[in-house]
């Protein structure tokens, strides 16, 4: 089985903080963007993967392909950082048999149909339900931009703003 060292929601995907901070702290040798939408959109996929450094393998795959790869002997010993666009994809991945115990909530951009709940996180009703599902499944949800930042309990933040 693959070794998942970080599961992070960050809709910027591969960017400076990922490349200079997170990847070093977790010593990942592979970055995997897990998104059904991006896996099917060749243009977005190419743009996202083009910024990965040459010393780190990067790929963008669907949720089902990630579940298969996780259990494949081919990826035994791979140390991977998983990047997600939203919490619903993580729920789907867990339900497909991939054990994720902690999710780092990094950034979800503001748009008109989203509610801003922190400086860096804006959510839809679907996102809120998915975060609640993750919490109900025992997944720890932490808000943290950088590895050096203090970890904040994202479930508590979500509860405080959605009362």
From Swiss-Prot:
Domain notes: The PTS EIIB type-4 domain is phosphorylated by phospho-EIIA on a histidyl residue. Then, it transfers the phosphoryl group to the sugar substrate concomitantly with the sugar uptake processed by the PTS EIIC type-4 domain.
Gene: levE
Induction: By fructose and LevR.
Protein name per Swiss-Prot or TrEMBL: PTS system fructose-specific EIIB component
Gene Ontology molecular function terms on file: kinase activity; protein-N(PI)-phosphohistidine-sugar phosphotransferase activity
Function, in words: The phosphoenolpyruvate-dependent sugar phosphotransferase system (sugar PTS), a major carbohydrate active -transport system, catalyzes the phosphorylation of incoming sugar substrates concomitantly with their translocation across the cell membrane. The enzyme II LevDE PTS system is involved in fructose transport.
Annotated localization: Cytoplasm
Domain PTS EIIB type-4: 1-163
Classification via CDD domains: PTS_IIB_man (cd00001)
UniProtKB keywords: Cytoplasm, Kinase, Phosphoprotein, Phosphotransferase system, Sugar transport, Transferase, Transport
UniProt cross-references to Gene3D superfamilies, sorted A to Z: Phosphotransferase system, sorbose subfamily IIB component
């Amino acid at each position: 089985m693959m070794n998942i060292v970080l599961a992070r929601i960050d809709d910027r995907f591969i960017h400076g903080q990922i490349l200079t901070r997170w990847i070093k702290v977790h010593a990942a040798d592979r970055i995997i963007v897990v998104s059904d939408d991006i896996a099917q959109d060749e243009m977005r996929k190419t743009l996202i993967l083009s910024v990965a450094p040459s010393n780190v393998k990067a790929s963008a795959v669907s949720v089902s392909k990630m579940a298969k790869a996780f259990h494949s002997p081919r990826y035994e010993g791979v140390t991977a950082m998983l990047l997600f666009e939203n919490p619903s994809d993580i729920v789907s991945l867990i339900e497909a048999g991939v054990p994720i115990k902690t999710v780092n909530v990094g950034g979800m951009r503001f748009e008109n149909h989203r509610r801003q709940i922190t400086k860096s996180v804006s959510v839809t009703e679907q996102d809120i339900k998915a975060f609640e599902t993750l919490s109900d499944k025992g997944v720890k949800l932490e808000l943290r931009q950088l590895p050096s930042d203090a970890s904040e309990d994202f479930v508590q933040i979500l509860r405080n703003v959605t009362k």
